[in-house]
Amino acid sequence: MSVQRNANKIKCMEIIKNLEKRGIAGYYCENAREASEKVLALIPDDARVAWGGSATLDEIEVKDKLQVLNAKIIDPSAYSDPEEVRQARTNALTSDVFLTGTNAITLKGELVNIDGTGNRVAALCFGPDKVIVVAGVNKIVKDEAAAIARIKTDACVANAIRLERKTPCALTGQCADCLIPGQTICSMTVVTRFCNKPNRIHVILVNESLGF
């Protein structure tokens, strides 16, 4: 193991300890393959599984493997009709398991997310019986202020481009705190600092750079 990877692992293990203090289960994986396997291990057979938009989940290729669990999939991206998309997002809030990434995680174990529609952070806060969060080491930051700065500088710009949004940041690469109906992806900010239902949230830290 390289010096940098070892340093990343030490940091992850400390964060996992801090997650446990917050009622959140934490796990460490060396790479995307291990992370994908861990996600599958945390999902019961025949579960109703949903997810929020996440480049990290795409990169670990876990969604395509859910068929081995006979999972019942709720996928809003499978629909083009706005009403069907809205209904799928609503149904996701009553799923057995919700999969998501996170925009940032602090050294103290706080999850920080900025959302456009709000369905992703809604499920993180309330609804699904179990939430599984996957995060690469590139998402680790010192504190909440650093998390917001990282998200505004890196994640939101990349996601605006990925989602083909007509926002200033998609054109210039810099956040302009825009207020554009149907386009702005920085609509709400949620900090998850504690889980009142112990181990409802499971965070998998991966010793690779994943997502934005």
Description of each model-found segment:
Residues 8-89, 94-99:
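N-terminal active-site beta-alpha-beta segment that forms phosphate/nucleotide-binding
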Residues 1-8:
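Glycine- and acidic-residue-enriched helix-capping/strand-helix junction motifs
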Residues 2, 24-26, 137:
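Short, flexible active-site loop motifs that bind/organize anionic cofactors or intermediates
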